[in-house]
Amino acid sequence: MKQICSILLFFLASAGSYAQNFADYFQNKTLRVDYIFTGNNKQQAIYLDELSQLPSWAGREHHLSELPLEGNGQIIVKDLATGQCIYKHSFSSLFQEWLSTDEAKETARGFENSFLLPYPKQPAEVEVVLFTPRKEVMTSFKHIVRPEDILIHKRGTTHVTPHRYMLRSGNEKECIDVAILAEG
């Protein structure tokens, strides 16, 4: 009985020690990464279009290196110094749906895709991977993000669209804002 308790205690202690702390790797900002997915049903490519910094992060801060859902694509952020995975996100893209159409057999097209990632404190490697329906790698693209890079555009601090809160139930870390937009 003592052995079982000690083994159980060991596993609980080691599981808690692996928990990743958001503040160790990320700032309270958002990195918007814009990509262009291009190609046809025979050949695909991914190109980096633009990097932008937004004023705060409103995404998850726990279980950062785990995939909450499985899609036909993934973004993996690794700490450049250690190679450790510090953030993962899955997605499904319109580009990959389009690849199954008849048009994709005859012509190549490009689709814009934007992803919001937590803003790293240190240089990080970002990898985008697209999968086939059988979960084989279709194409991938890696690039380095250096947080102090002057080519990362700062957005969201000026030219903010006028808005008003009808009800503010708490701070942004605990509540979700709902926007109501008129048609037209």
List PLM regions with ranges.
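Sec-dependent N-terminal signal peptides
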Residues: I4-A13
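Short non-domain terminal segments
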Residues: L8-L9, Q20-D24, Y35
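Sec/Tat signal peptide C-region and signal peptidase I cleavage site
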Residues: A15-A19
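Beta-strand-enriched, solvent-exposed domains that form extended recognition/catalytic surfaces
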Residues: Y25-V160
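Fold-level signature of zinc-dependent metallopeptidase catalytic domains
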Residues: L151-G184
